[in-house]
């Protein structure tokens, strides 16, 4: 485990400011090129949003690296972390893509299966699509997408398609993360922000009258996972889902370079990975502050907020994996 020099000014150290403020700071719009593919079940369309670099094809594959971002719950290519990473990737001259999970990115789900935090088969399917056109693939996952990517790296081992991975603000122990989200601010602020959109999607899907009644009564993510996520994805209960989908038990099996970045004050997380939980191929980067996918600093010289802490470390890690 290594500590870093991330040291925001005192007025930016609050974890909730770090978590909430980025949404309002990132103003840049990006002109993505969208392609639709079928999911791993061949049921629903999923959207891949690309930003392409100048490159040439050799034997049908682009030669510059592709950075793949797996988004968080209800995230998209327009999420603040996607846009800040995209800018850094463009500066490096690499390709960039956000493959959206089922029902995300404005593309409605067609089948009964949505997305969940442990669906590594879906990640493998997405990366397989991309590997057909790109020689070198680096992957980054944030929050829910970070847990899925970390689990993928351990579960697939040498068969993981990406060369290396960066995992940010990931709830690698889903049960304790669910408890953390039930704390006062989580229940009052974060839960409604995440829960309401996904319940609306579920209500628009193929559901029974009993499911409709239960979903309308859901008050927290645990309720939603028990009513919808677990049964839809073949789990007995939310606890069974959390146990099987959590990345933590798989971290010792990782054989490709993986960087896990976590803030100690992340309000979304419970149990986090320690050195004894991971393989020798995993680097743990832990900061005192940063909140959940925040890591905002401030430059007094330019009087501007700085959002590049995570993107710069991710790119440096990727380039070091070559």
Where do the language-model regions lie?
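Alpha/beta-hydrolase-fold enzymes
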Residues: 133, 138-233
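N-terminal cap/lid segment of alpha/beta-hydrolase-fold proteins
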Residues: 11-60, 305
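Short beta-strand element of the alpha/beta-hydrolase
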Residues: 63-72
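Catalytic nucleophile-loop/oxyanion-hole region of alpha/beta-hydrolase
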Residues: 86-88, 102-138, 304
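Active-site nucleophile elbow and catalytic-triad environment of alpha/beta-hydrolase enzymes
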Residues: 227-250
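Short beta-strand/loop motif that positions the catalytic acidic residue
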Residues: 254, 260-262
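Short amphipathic alpha-helix adjacent to the substrate-entry channel of hydrolases
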Residues: 80-98
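Catalytic active-site module of serine/aspartate enzymes centered on a nucleophile-bearing elbow/loop
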Residues: 290-322
